[in-house]
Amino acid sequence: MRQDIRFLLNGQPQRVSHAAGDLTLLGWLREQPHLRGTKQGCGEGDCGACTVALGRPDESGQLVWSPINACILFLPMVDGAAIRTVDGLAAADGQLHPVQAAMVAADAAQCGFCTPGFVMSLYVAWQNRDGLGQDSIDDTLAGNLCRCTGYRAIVSAALALAAPDVHSPADRSDAAEAAALAALCAAGDHDDDLVVDQGATSFYAPTTPAAFADFYAENPDSVIVAGATDVGLWVTKQHRTLGQMLWTGRVPQFDRVVRDDDRLFIGPAVTHQRFADAIAADLPELAELMRRFAAQQVRSSGTICGNIANASPIGDLPPALIALGSAVELTRLGAVRQLALEDFFIAYGQQDRAAGEFVSGIYMPAQPAPHLRCYKISKRFDQDISAVMLAANVDIVDGVITAPRLAFGGMAAIPKRAAAAEAALIGKPVEMTTFQQAAVALADDFTPLSDMRGSAAYRMATAQNLLVKYGLDLSEGQKFRLAGAGLASVMERW
């Protein structure tokens, strides 16, 4: 076993041998190398002030960069990666990086606290040659908040960076960094299991499925960590001592998206962003939900199976996967079983999962679902928890509804299908009266609660309206969307 965390920081090799398993990347950056350009804002992966760039090599050895929230990512999770912070962008002679220069030219900083995070999100887009246009800049910056509301100047800087003649591809070369990372990872023991056990919390990162399953069967109270977008908050906001953590991220077989004739398998380490890319062509409706589900920082770290395993009453993704007829795979040692995803959720905080058993994958249909619609109602358009979520899917044969699947989030203690409303749709024509009658039946399916995101009456009325909206989508042959114009589009009119 290996006990040192190895990564690149602004191009320089790092080996960290003495660290607590639950030390965050942000905590280490600010206290050890004293790189304090990266800021702590919310401490929960929401504001983006802590954004840094994380690069991992693709199959060709080139680095692919992602923005991540350093405030909730545990330091051992950057093992084998390249990290770049705002402190490392300028050249040794002090010349600003093109992203920094564009921000200065656009007067895009006010109080300046959020500026490093915005710079790093734009840096990732600049490195990847994607996400700086008018049609994509909103998504690029959705995970960064500016309390001074200086967004217009920041967007202007981004659009300036998108000009094709501003910077040559040579400016973006990170071949030397990729080579340095490859050399760091070439040590004979690099592929050994990683153990970080300083302090009260230890962090174990096995490299094979068998080692992972064996450890969890022997230590069923371990906290499984995938992207830390949920577990990270247990440390930063709830101040919990986690004891033993078990990470999925160093098992290559866990990071798989496998397509066969009629099903798609999603492994336990597959991120939201990779999943969205894999299903975009066949399931554009679901891909659009993924864009609203979370900003790029969270999509780049959080995983599909982690979202299922934490069993949120809303979750956004579980209703959509239930509407598609997906199944969850559970593993304990050599025993593997599958069950329908809606049967996995039993009650609030309770799933059909035995001690030592973990979510080892999701199976979902691989073919397009032309009648799938996903409706997310939240106070913010991007990166917000839903008040009500509806994922609806039906088959239509000769104008008649068959096999309806209506799955709601935010209406019960678990993501749940609406059995009475589904029964009201079966065998009925695709017309508005059908869906109006089904909407009335929702009162037999749910007794929602009131909380800070909405009253019980609001949730019921919204759920009924969403089902009628689905009927409009199908019967009128057009889509009705609650979509914002976007910052770049608004700027065109100013």
Show the residue positions of the predicted features.
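A basic, amphipathic helix-loop patch mediating RNA/tRNA/ribosome contacts
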Residues: 20-52
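C-terminal structural segment of proteins
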Residues: 8, 13, 53-57, 63-69, ...
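Short, surface-exposed linear segments at secondary-structure transitions and domain or protein termini
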Residues: 23-28, 74-82, 346-354, 382-384
